[in-house]
């Protein structure tokens, strides 16, 4: 989609790169059942002809960091939902994107797994120094994962509100964020913005 006005530039002010380093993760893992987890997470590298020793070492480290090293030769049907989402994220991170676009990446998971996986993924993305834009309909998830929440209007979608999130916590995990003293305030603000539309 072209912008109505202006241009969109991501880490490329002179326009010299052919493609921006953007990773995209859908709400469903879309792992191929006929490929092993290892073959699934290296698929992007394979397509881009980038299966270098350095990239393979990076994938091996990600598999270890995400607790999937022992499962890399398994098929997706042998993994839990949370493990499959971790594999999908590794596939996204394997190409070393600077910007991650996550479209409801945890919505297919049960609540407990969703909390654990979102916490793991958020911490790993922060540790890697990546920027994440996440689409979610879960207010608690938005508050606990984001530095800034954008509320969109009904169709056609426009930015209705921008709410910076500042939680006073030592532990910045999404699970701990739900216990921050400011959390109820932000939840109420977002809820009011959303109920204004109905």
Model-derived segments and spans:
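A short, proline-enriched helix->beta-strand linker immediately N-terminal to the Walker B motif
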Residues: 94-98
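Conserved ABC transporter NBD signature motif
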Residues: 3-18
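Short helical segment in ABC ATPase nucleotide-binding domains corresponding to the A-loop/adjacent helical element
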Residues: 38-46, 56, 164
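Catalytic "switch" loops of ABC-type ATPases
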Residues: 27-34, 138
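Conserved ABC ATPase signature
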Residues: 75-79, 83
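Catalytic Walker B motif of ABC-type/P-loop ATPase nucleotide-binding domains
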Residues: 100-103
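Hydrophobic anchor residue at the start of the ABC signature
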Residues: 89
């Amino acid at each position: 989609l072209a912008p109505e006005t202006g241009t969109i530039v991501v880490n490329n002010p002179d326009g010299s790169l052919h493609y921006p380093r953007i990773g995209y993760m859908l709400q469903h893992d879309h792992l191929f059942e006929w490929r092993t987890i290892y073959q699934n997470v290296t698929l992007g590298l394979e397509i881009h002809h980038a299966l270098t020793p350095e990239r393979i070492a990076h994938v091996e480290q990600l598999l270890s960091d995400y607790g999937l090293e022992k499962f890399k030769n398994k098929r997706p049907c042998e993994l839990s939902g949370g493990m499959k989402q971790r594999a999908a994220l590794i596939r996204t991170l394997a190409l070393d994107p600077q910007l991650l676009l996550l479209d409801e990446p945890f919505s297919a998971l049960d609540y407990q797994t969703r909390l654990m996986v979102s916490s793991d993924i958020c911490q790993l993305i922060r540790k890697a120094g990546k920027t994440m834009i996440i689409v979610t309909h879960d207010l608690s998830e938005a508050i606990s994962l984001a530095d800034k929440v954008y509320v969109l209007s009904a169709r056609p979608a426009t930015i209705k509100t921008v709410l910076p999130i500042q939680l006073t916590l030592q532990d910045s995990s999404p699970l701990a964020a739900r216990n921050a003293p400011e959390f109820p305030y932000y939840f109420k603000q977002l809820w009011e913005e959303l109920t204004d539309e109905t």
